């Protein structure tokens, strides 16, 4: 009977493991461009919505308050420019 010797690792090979290169299926440029457009539209719509809600809930009141402090009374806001009141003859 013959004795067979097995060589487990070849002597001339590098023993480090190099995984095979896997190429991912590349998406078409039109799909990536469409995705960027969708993201841009979503960001724009959300920012416009936030600004609209901020204006209706908060900023409009702040603008009216600023105008009221600048003028004499809050009733003068809707009537535009009113003449200055004379301090010598106060009104009724």
UniProtKB/Swiss-Prot annotation:
The keyword Glycosyltransferase does not apply. The chain crosses the membrane at residues 38-58. It is a single-pass membrane protein. It is found in: Host membrane. Changing residue 56 to S: In strain: Mild. Keywords: Host membrane, Membrane, Transmembrane, Transmembrane helix, Transport, Viral movement protein. One of its GO terms (cellular component) is host cell membrane. GO terms for biological process: transport of virus in host, cell to cell. Involved in the viral transport within, and between cells. Belongs to the mastrevirus movement protein family. Interacts with the capsid protein (CP). Part of a MP-CP-viral DNA complex. This is Movement protein. It comes from Bean yellow dwarf virus (BeYDV).
